[in-house]
């Protein structure tokens, strides 16, 4: 099989010392190459070239670094879809050092979007996820490294995890952006005698990217302007556990709510929207009101969160897995026999 693959090696995106997306994908590609498959690659933020660079050939299979981002990437994705070729998307997974792999798109267009609530019922019992949960909590292990330890204000607050300002999950799946969510949540909190605690996105810490600088300026202005808005950089689990609830657009930190068994509201259409693990409402005022009034079944949400954690741990492609297991899971998610 002739395979075209998007490769990226950008550690800052994960807030880590290396990019585990590249570590996992290059291992898979090398094994498939050993089995007789051939590769060309499109490179993103990379100087090294482990495979011949993509020109304009015809391929049997396209492994895409998400169908979003640069126009050339979107055009390539659409080209191979239109041609009836199998296309698999991948990006950072929700668990530490993992990949999300999907035969359609990501977020609210995932292959699993409409069926995930039923799929996670495979979990034998919610308690089956407890060993996984405790390991993550005790090790303070999140999708991204948790290093800072700012003091958390002794107030009642709504927690907002930072996201990339123009992230694909926001631009493509929410009518309300991060700035809009922050503004509306600050106003809502003031009306109800609450504060807002905001944790900056760890992948943007120290970044000189224009979007990162724009976001830093925005959050600094909000802290200066609103006395009930606090920027706090510490363990995301601690921030979630002490909050009244979490409010986000469509954040990868939803998995941290799942691990910490805490309620989360999303105004963007996420992978988790129909799973029973989150409250999804594109109307921010309405969603915040639902959360504050606790107009949902919290015990049911917690059980669904545990089932989801079990399912993700069982079926996500993770760096620690043997290569045969990674290929087995990749085949399951992609629908492509390798």
Task: Please annotate each region the language model reported.
Residues 1-58, 191, 333-338:
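N-terminal pre-catalytic "stem/leader" segment of glycosyltransferase-like enzymes
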Residues 61-75, 232-279:
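A donor-sugar binding/catalytic signature common to diverse glycosyltransferases
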Residues 39, 43-44, 183-232:
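Catalytic donor nucleotide-activated moiety binding site of glycosyltransferases and closely related
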Residues 55, 151, 238-242:
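Structural alpha-helical scaffold elements that stabilize or flank donor/cofactor-binding regions
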Residues 5-14, 149-206, 309-314:
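Active-site donor-nucleotide binding/catalytic segment of nucleotide-sugar enzymes
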Residues 9-12, 46-49, 67-70, 93-96, ...:
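Short, solvent-exposed loop/turn segments at secondary-structure junctions
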Residues 22-31, 40-102:
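Extended catalytic core of nucleotide-activated donor transferases of GT-like folds
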Residues 104-152, 276-338:
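Leloir-type glycosyltransferase catalytic cores
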